[in-house]
Amino acid sequence: MSRTGKIKRRTVESDPIFANRLLARFINRSMRDGKKSVSQRMVYKALDMVKEKNLDPLVVFQSAVQNVAPRMEVRPRRVGGASYQVPSEVRGDRRISLSIRWLIQAARNRSNKQYHTFADKLAAELLDAYNNAGEAIRKRDLMHRNAEANKAFSHFRW
């Protein structure tokens, strides 16, 4: 069987409250065990907490995702038996996916003593990312440092 056909990309429907596709992707990614309504409730609660700080929740969310999105990454490339970490630019869709994944992971890793619910953790992480701080921003900076350190191997890109 030949593999000539292109796979059609599935589009995500925008979320019901803010009518935003990026937020819908975020909700889907934060979902556990297929419980979307629980995920929606927690994300919207986190955005309400951001709103209580007299900030526009959608602007904070979008800025946080953009701030965390990496521009460069390293990819392994085998050349003559040796494997090199070759820095390359991150394409648009992968940037957003990594950003969403890191924000959710950073929120889940926050302390349960200080932040009792996932909504508390997520609100804190979104505000930190909005202000260019927090664990997700550290992860992005680590990736950029790694790409910078392996700049010597950038000629292996093809």
Language model regions located:
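Strongly charged
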Residues: 1-33, 37-40, 44-158
